[in-house]
Amino acid sequence: MAKSGKKYIQALSKVDKLKSYSIDDAISLLKEIKFVKFDETIDVSVNLNLKKNHTVRDTVVLPNQFMREKRILVFAKGDKAEEAREAGAVYVGDDDLINKVKGGFSDFDVVVATPDMMKDVGKLGPILGKRGLMPNPKTQTITNDLKGTIASLKKGRTEFRANKNGVINFSVGKSSMDNNKVKENYDEFIKELLKRRPSDLKGTFVDSVYMSSTMGPSVKIDFV
């Protein structure tokens, strides 16, 4: 939805586009200029200085959760399938579940697989890849530690990744949350992101950071 209209313009007029705001001031300002009734999500957009061969992708567990619990689907057999069920996975299976997904089933938010299942799960690449759900070692979703992985996902472990333009868009809270909790989530995300700086990158890693609410204008963050 395009961000336009009188209320948006009024909100935009309160943002100094030439200023970089501290994270505390940015969160406060976004709440001050809020003009919709629903509980907006607070997002950050990070512009990275990356080369074409660079990939930035990882996961983070935010200290203050705000999203609904993810529906976890696990591809596993035998004892590992039972481990996944006991850990709280919503959907667990092997060949039958693979065929179900091939048939159009998509009522899940995250996919985990044991290594021995990947030969068959790989055939779902066109389906899962399109949604960014293909199991991957970098996101710890190809694993034999199903109990630990599922527990982490249920606590809110969330993936972040740079797109082809070197931009990461990531949600850090809701407008209804305490400012300090939003800040703690932001700080944790940035801490984990900085660990993913490519080893051969010269110069600045983070070019700029902006914060915005769902319907509101963006605010530039003073990132040092």
Curated annotation (Swiss-Prot):
Superkingdom of the organism of origin: Bacteria
Keyword Nuclease: no
Signal peptide (residue range): none
Quaternary assembly: Part of the 50S ribosomal subunit.
HAMAP family cross-referenced by the UniProt entry: Ribosomal_uL1_B
Family (UniProt): Belongs to the universal ribosomal protein uL1 family.
Name of protein: Large ribosomal subunit protein uL1
Organism lineage: Bacteria, Pseudomonadati, Spirochaetota, Spirochaetia, Spirochaetales
